[in-house]
């Protein structure tokens, strides 16, 4: 009787293995639709650079698109680019439902801009109109304020943006120009040391969906910002940590945890980018509560973050600092003599027991999207003005320009930009970015040097 039972269980096990094998063979034969394969192929490079896999793989596993073994195979690859390539190699072999499940997983993991890219490409291939995205209001391609009261936003009529000068389809495929050996040799001695691999850790914290009593609007275009920054920072040689939709308390806790990571000891710099609604001196969590920016800086100062002492720390704040829209002024005839004033810093170190003391806060540079009291502008398809300008300048000039000078160039780009939304208060609106610095040396990022 026992022997019979054992044979029965063994038979069931063999049948199970045969069924699994048969399912795999069916998937291989009945593969992905050719249009879906072509869509993935046309966007392969963008997907390989921009996909964020940690959560995405779990969704694909839950949908039976990949197996546990496949997930382990992907995760075993070194680096995010190689992992993304491995997933893209597997997807076309995972059956006719794989493409739709992949798009759904992108949407569920807040990578809707990549889903939009795929669906737009697919519609071009099939010669049909692209479906509307539910991730953002695609009827508002012009600039909107980062944190405008509801009564102001209600005036943004969909009848006014057909000829929007701000139209765009999302972040471009980024490339960062590498630093030459000659430039490095000529500048490294007068600059901060930036040789570690990776250059440092970067944290991108993006709040898009808001709850609570503040009635803060969905940050349409915010997904474009964080994806663009993640790509830029990776190309500049940073290990990037990404956090989405955090409450004010969660933001404070995650920033503190990030500041205390042991990896800061063996890297040469650090980046923190905060993308959300805001007011002067504070940035909103998704619960409508404020995190004070001074608290953010305190977490990374010399007293609280000794691992980053004497190392450059970069902060980028994409948020309003008030609710005033900059209407701009008419420029007078004649040459423009406007210049940005310089800012001198003094050394105040004293020796004690032959050990140099440090000021509590130093070696920081912070870029703000707008001036105090003003609103920051954001394009619902291309992302915020500031992040777009920042990405453009850093990708083109990090190879031969230090960070402070690049932020001056960002200011120049923002100064020239003008909103286009006829019939609304945002028509011909302006924005002016700024930065503040306690850097003590020139900060060159030296992208791509030394070659790996």
From Swiss-Prot:
The modification Phosphoserine is found at residues 157, 340. It comes from the Eukaryota. Residues 327-336 have a biased composition (Basic and acidic residues). Its EC number is 3.4.22.55. GO terms for molecular function: cysteine-type endopeptidase activity; identical protein binding; protein domain specific binding. SMART domains: CARD, CASc. Involved in the activation cascade of caspases responsible for apoptosis execution. Might function by either activating some proteins required for cell death or inactivating proteins necessary for cell survival. Associates with PIDD1 and CRADD to form the PIDDosome, a complex that activates CASP2 and triggers apoptosis in response to genotoxic stress. The CARD domain mediates a direct interaction with CRADD. Heterotetramer that consists of two anti-parallel arranged heterodimers, each one formed by a p18 subunit and a p12 subunit. Forms a complex named the PIDDosome with PIDD1 and CRADD. Interacts with NOL3 (via CARD domain); inhibits CASP2 activity in a phosphorylation-dependent manner. This is Caspase-2. It comes from Rattus norvegicus. The gene is Casp2.
């Amino acid at each position: 009787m026992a022997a019979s039972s054992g044979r029965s269980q063994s038979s069931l096990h063999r049948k199970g293995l045969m069924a699994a094998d048969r399912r795999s063979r069916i998937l291989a034969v009945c593969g992905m639709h050719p249009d879906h394969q072509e869509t993935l192929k046309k966007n392969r490079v963008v997907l390989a650079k921009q996909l964020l896999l940690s959560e995405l793989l779990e969704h694909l596993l839950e949908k039976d698109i990949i197996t546990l073994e496949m997930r382990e195979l992907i995760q075993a690859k070194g680096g995010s680019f190689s992992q993304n390539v491995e997933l893209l190699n597997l997807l076309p072999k995972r059956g006719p439902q794989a493409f739709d499940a992949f798009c759904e997983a992108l949407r569920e993991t807040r990578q809707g801009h990549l889903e939009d890219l795929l669906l737009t490409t697919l519609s071009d291939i099939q010669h049909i109109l692209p479906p509307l995205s539910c991730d953002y209001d695609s009827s508002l391609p012009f600039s909107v304020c980062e944190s405008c009261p509801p009564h102001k936003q209600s005036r943004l009529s969909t009848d006014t943006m057909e000829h929007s000068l701000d139209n765009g389809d999302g972040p471009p495929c980024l490339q960062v120009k590498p630093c030459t050996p000659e430039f490095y040799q000529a500048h490294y001695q007068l600059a901060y040391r930036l040789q570690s691999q990776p250059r440092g850790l970067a944290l991108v914290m993006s709040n898009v969906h808001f709850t609570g009593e503040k009635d803060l609007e969905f940050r349409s275009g915010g997904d474009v910002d964080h994806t663009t920054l993640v790509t830029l920072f990776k190309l500049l040689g940073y290990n990037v940590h990404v956090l989405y939709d955090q409450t004010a308390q969660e933001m404070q806790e995650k920033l503190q945890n990030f500041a205390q990571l042991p990896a800061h000891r063996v890297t040469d710099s650090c980046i923190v980018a905060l993308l959300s609604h805001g007011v002067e001196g504070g940035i909103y969590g998704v619960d409508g509560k404020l995190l004070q920016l001074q608290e953010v800086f305190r977490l990374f100062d010399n007293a609280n973050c000794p691992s980053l002492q004497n190392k450059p720390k970069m902060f980028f704040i994409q948020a309003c600092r008030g609710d005033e829209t900059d209407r701009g002024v008419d420029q007078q005839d004649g040459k423009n003599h406007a210049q940005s004033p310089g800012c001198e810093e003094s050394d105040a170190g004293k020796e004690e027991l032959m050990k140099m003391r440090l000021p509590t806060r130093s070696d920081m540079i912070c870029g703000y999207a707008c001036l105090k009291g003003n609103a920051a502008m954001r394009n619902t398809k291309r992302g915020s003005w500031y992040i777009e300008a920042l990405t453009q300048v850093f990708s083109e000039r990090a190879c031969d320009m230090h960070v402070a000078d690049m932020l001056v160039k960002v200011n120049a780009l923002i100064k020239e930009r003008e909103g286009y939304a006829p019939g609304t208060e945002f028509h011909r609106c302006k924005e002016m970015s700024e930065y503040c610095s306690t850097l003590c040396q020139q900060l060159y990022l030296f992208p791509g040097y030394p070659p790996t």
